[in-house]
């Protein structure tokens, strides 16, 4: 833009921003270009010819993943290669946290183990299926693959899972419209029997993160997959998070009995209130209720939608006695990681002077009764609605979480209520953006800006929620001018902003939150050649907060297709007409170099050369055992393959037939032997009897 036009542009932009309308060009950069590309779209545009769109097959072809030979250990070694984009590295680590929260699968940096997963920036997004025992097993997170559910999807392949729609019973649930599929891509819709992949007796899952979308490999604009239950037509192909059935299958496959970082969840639906106890060190008690006259009218878990259910814990402050306290303590918990996050919803129907204190009671050898430590004091609690709170803990000994309600002075008609408590060994989000009356905003087709926030490094930022589209919701991250700008490094280097639309399911393990991350690359330039992440006062536009304070807002960076409005209205994103967006901005500059590897490196080529002369039959897979190539043969519950090349098939039925035949044969032989023995014995005694008779006759003759 010509320099003499710049002041007029600022005036015009300021007018639009103040009026609540978007600035020219919305002053944002859409990293998706307005197109919500799935994994298979990305790979197709790159011209990749991968099995089922994102699976790398070994030379032996499609292998069965039935049997323990194809499982990884519960802790999987990995390397993040330096070729990966910085944003992708951070997203991968966040995906690992989702695995830890919901399964017993863990990940550790490679330290010389025989087999490990090497994550690199290849062409597209793809993985092998199962542990192929190749030493270095590659998994590609290429350009535009740096979305958390995409990473989860590819690692599920590596853990041994095929796509949901290829399972043996899929024709009972979906219809494949073959004439709408791209020519030459029909094989991506093949169906496979239980000898190749096992559904683990879990129902067909329309919501699986491993399912194709309805538009997969289409040759036009019409759907290639039609669900037999029409309500799931726009559900299949979700790329937000694991579904419940995804987790059930994964936990069954790896015999998980618990998840690694999850600690506790309580919605107070059961009378035992999740093992929580009333303290003896207070002057009142918390009560389990489903409604309070002064509010809340219903719990947060069910929002009054389920009859005879919907409970929360309530501390009554209407007595008017200032300083009255009630302490509710969790069951004893045992930490493993040294950091935890407590999440809960709080409702204030009393006076503004009431407060909630969150403590930990930590038990050590020297303090058998526990040491009470204040972790957070919550004052000035808004009244009339449920509010979400997070409390960060750093506990290393066994402990309890303690909720203390404190009544304020003066008259009060209500009290404090808590519901939907979750405790996990994860990092709490840094900030919460609570948007109320969201349905009204959604219908207004407007752009909404968050309040200003600060990152842990001191950078000021703002989030832009774009509701102007009738079908999609956009989400953008802006740096803004702040109090620390003179002391900060510019252009802003390697700050990763993670923005999460919260699925408000009461149990953190059952959520399918929608998340997107972007990272500030200090070398990234804008269309006019200026650094995108430079100081906002230098490259931004003038804007105003609602109170009239002026500031500078840098260009937004994000996506116009963050989520469809249809998905936004599903699950529990929108609850009580409230939406929560969780925000974390952290420095990931330490991830610049991650590929240092120790000792001798097992190479894929050695394994492939050894197996190149071996052809395993019937879905067997070639592996190295002490340097020798051997076929690992697939097996099911009542069948198996055997032999040097898995060329022979055995089954329980065959074994029974053989066993019965052998038994009959042995019985027949024994019977024959017995009959012969009896015959010979009888013949022997007949001869003796005949000889004795002859002797007696001779004696009688001599007597005469």
UniProtKB/Swiss-Prot annotation:
Under Gene Ontology molecular function, one entry of this record is: metalloendopeptidase activity
Q: Provide the alphabetized UniProt keywords.
A: Cell membrane, Disulfide bond, EGF-like domain, Glycoprotein, Hydrolase, Inflammatory response, Membrane, Metal-binding, Metalloprotease, Phosphoprotein, Protease, Secreted, Signal, Transmembrane, Transmembrane helix, Zinc, Zymogen
Q: Which InterPro entries match?
A: ConA-like_dom_sf, EGF-like_dom, MAM_dom, MATH/TRAF_dom, Meprin, MetalloPept_cat_dom_sf, Peptidase_M12A, Peptidase_Metallo
Q: Where is the signal peptide?
A: 1-20
Q: Which organism is it from?
A: Rattus norvegicus (Rat)
| Propeptide residue interval(s) | 21-64
> Which gene carries the instructions for this protein?
Mep1b
- Xref: Pfam families: Astacin (PF01400), MAM (PF00629), MATH_2 (PF22486)
Q: How is it modified after translation?
A: N-glycosylated; contains high mannose and/or complex biantennary structures.
Name of the protein in its database record: Meprin A subunit beta
Q: Which GO terms describe its cellular component?
A: extracellular region; membrane; meprin A complex; plasma membrane
Stated membrane topology is:
Single-pass type I membrane protein
- Describe the effect of residue 492 to A: Only occurs as a monomer
State which tissues express it. Kidney, intestinal brush borders and salivary ducts.
